[in-house]
């Protein structure tokens, strides 16, 4: 702690780990800090305030946090006035131990009171002692807080927070609480305001997004919300994540198929293809229901790309159980999957289940699963060679774009496509480019032919306006990309 006085604006950096909810929460943390007078630390410069927005779903989340805190200890000791704050799910879980294991931490705050961060930082500075404040229920719905959006053309929009499911492997509901829903009018007002600012793609976000409406008793609230988004003038693309198979109903499928700006893309977490394992996981669906949902989605939207989450090595999983998962992967023909080796989390029912699977068995099954997922994804991508696709061009999409002199974007189905921009034509993030796919790989497509068409958009204008004036770096380091960027494996899945 330090009582050093500061005459210039204090700088900040937010480091984010985990799911999309954390990415969006970090946009709010950034907005709160800037609203309180902090400025983003320029690239390469040590920030006065470093905020960790943490994840608690997987075991390596703990190791990652405390490892990073350890690296900062000597930096803080040599930097008068520097402060470190830890928030998010791991802070909610480890509230009593963080300042014991890392006594140089100044502030610990939870998932329910992110709006308190600026006040807690100031209190820690003035009182010269650590401030630990964890609430057990939501203080203010996060959507009311100041937000600094990372993208000029795409945005997260929360429809709910919390989760009412009780999956035995997941600790998130105990950390984020029961589901609380925003009212449709409030959500649509935010969407319309974003579009007015130049956003043309939104992703509706919830721990169990299609359960939206349970709090106010409307079982079709989510499908109605999708259709209402279709009426927002200027909104090009609507996506959502993540649904739960148990509540995924035919009215949602119909709304997706019948609303032109709802994209033909679905992320539907499987977790396991074994009915026995699904029962042990307390997932309230079985293999037949899951495959039936996918069949109805593809009947309504033949070109839909479907991705999933799969956990390998859940306690009690036998070779036959695993083969059932492989069967579902073959039948479902996912365009991609986030695959995870089961991680025991203290405080979850699964942590105490008998028959924990040996690590070497889990590793073998994981490698076989990944190989199959990649094989199928590649086959599905090859079918798109020769097809024309309209891409929303995005910033920071391809790691090799600078070396290959390409740009990157996402198709309606959310597949990543790298393409060669035409000479003499400015194509900005947020603009729409139509290309013809010439090459397929398991995780991306390439369009090396001429660009068929470019449509300049209000989102491209917004991106250009944001980047016209010199500005410091965003101050946010994301464990996952911003909306519109490619989707590599996240640190952990959301509660789904």
Swiss-Prot record:
Domain MTTase N-terminal: 10-126
Binding partners and assembly: Monomer.
Chief site of localization: cytoplasm
Annotated catalysed reactions: N(6)-dimethylallyladenosine(37) in tRNA + (sulfur carrier)-SH + AH2 + 2 S-adenosyl-L-methionine = 2-methylsulfanyl-N(6)-dimethylallyladenosine(37) in tRNA + (sulfur carrier)-H + 5'-deoxyadenosine + L-methionine + A + S-adenosyl-L-homocysteine + 2 H(+)
Annotated localization: Cytoplasm
Keyword tRNA processing among UniProt keywords: yes
UniProt keyword annotations, A-Z: 4Fe-4S, Cytoplasm, Iron, Iron-sulfur, Metal-binding, S-adenosyl-L-methionine, Transferase, tRNA processing
Protein name (Swiss-Prot/TrEMBL): tRNA-2-methylthio-N(6)-dimethylallyladenosine synthase
EC number: 2.8.4.3
Presence of keyword Disulfide bond: no
InterPro entries: Elp3/MiaA/NifB-like_rSAM (IPR006638), Methylthiotransferase (IPR005839), Methylthiotransferase_CS (IPR020612), Methylthiotransferase_N (IPR013848), Methylthiotransferase_N_sf (IPR038135), MiaB_methiolase (IPR006463), rSAM (IPR007197), rSAM_horseshoe (IPR023404)
Cofactor, how bound (note): Binds 2 [4Fe-4S] clusters. One cluster is coordinated with 3 cysteines and an exchangeable S-adenosyl-L-methionine.
Region annotated Disordered, chain positions: 465-496
Organism: Nocardioides sp. (strain ATCC BAA-499 / JS614)
GO molecular function, one term: N6-isopentenyladenosine methylthiotransferase activity
Compositionally biased spans, kind Pro residues: 487-496
Residues engaged in binding [4Fe-4S] cluster 2: 163, 167, 170
A family per Pfam: UPF0004
Gene Ontology cellular component terms for the protein in this record: cytosol
Similarity-based family: Belongs to the methylthiotransferase family. MiaB subfamily.
TRAM domain sequence ranges: 382-451
Span of domain Radical SAM core: 149-380
Chain's gene name: miaB
Binding-site residues, [4Fe-4S] cluster 1: 19, 55, 89
């Amino acid at each position: 702690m330090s009582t050093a006085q500061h005459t210039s604006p204090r700088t900040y950096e937010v480091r984010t780990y985990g799911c999309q909810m954390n990415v969006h929460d970090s946009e709010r943390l950034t907005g709160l800090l800037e609203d309180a007078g902090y400025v983003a630390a320029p690239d390469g410069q040590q920030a006065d305030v470093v905020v960790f927005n943490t994840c608690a779903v997987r075991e390596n989340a703990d190791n990652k946090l405390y490892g990073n805190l350890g690296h900062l200890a000597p930096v803080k000791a040599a930097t008068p006035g520097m402060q470190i704050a830890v928030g998010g799910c791991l802070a909610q879980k480890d509230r009593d131990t963080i300042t014991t294991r890392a006594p140089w931490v100044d502030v610990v705050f939870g998932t329910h009171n992110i709006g308190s961060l600026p006040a807690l930082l100031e209190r820690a500075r003035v009182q010269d002692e650590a401030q630990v404040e964890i609430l057990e229920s939501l203080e203010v719905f996060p959507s009311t807080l100041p937000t600094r959006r990372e993208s000029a053309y795409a945005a997260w929009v929360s429809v709910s927070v919390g989760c009412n499911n009780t999956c035995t492997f997941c600790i998130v509901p105990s950390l984020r609480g029961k589901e609380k829903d925003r009212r449709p009018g409030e959500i649509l007002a935010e969407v319309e305001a974003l579009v007015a600012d130049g956003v043309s793609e939104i992703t509706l976000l919830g721990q169990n997004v299609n359960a939206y409406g349970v709090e106010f008793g409307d079982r079709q609230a989510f499908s109605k919300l999708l259709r209402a988004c279709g009426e927002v003038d200027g909104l090009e693309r609507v996506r959502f994540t993540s649904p739960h198979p148990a509540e995924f109903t035919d009215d949602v499928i119909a709304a997706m198929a019948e609303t032109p700006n709802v994209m033909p893309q679905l992320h539907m977490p499987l977790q396991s293809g074994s009915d026995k394992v699904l029962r042990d996981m307390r997932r309230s669906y079985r293999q037949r229901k899951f495959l039936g949902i996918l069949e109805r989605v593809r009947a309504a939207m033949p070109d839909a790309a479907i991705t999933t989450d799969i956990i390998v090595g859940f306690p009690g999983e036998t070779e036959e159980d695993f083969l059932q998962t492989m069967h579902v992967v073959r039948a479902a023909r996912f365009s991609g999957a986030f695959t995870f080796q089961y991680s025991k989390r203290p405080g979850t029912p699964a942590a105490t289940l008998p028959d924990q699977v040996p690590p070497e068995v889990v590793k073998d099954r994981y490698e076989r699963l990944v190989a199959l997922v990649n094989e199928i994804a590649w086959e599905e991508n090859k079918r798109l060679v020769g097809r024309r696709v309209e891409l929303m061009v995005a910033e920071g999409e391809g790691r090799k774009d600078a070396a290959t002199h390409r740009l990157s974007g996402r198709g309606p189905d959310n597949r990543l496509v790298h393409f060669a921009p035409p000479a003499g034509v400015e194509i900005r993030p947020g603009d729409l480019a139509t290309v013809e796919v010439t090459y397929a790989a398991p995780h991306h497509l390439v369009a090396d032919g001429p660009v068929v068409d470019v449509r300049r958009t209000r989102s491209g204008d917004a991106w250009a306006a944001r980047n016209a004036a010199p500005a410091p770096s965003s101050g946010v380091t994301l464990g996952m990309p911003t909306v519109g960027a490619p989707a590599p494996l996240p640190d952990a899945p959301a509660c789904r």
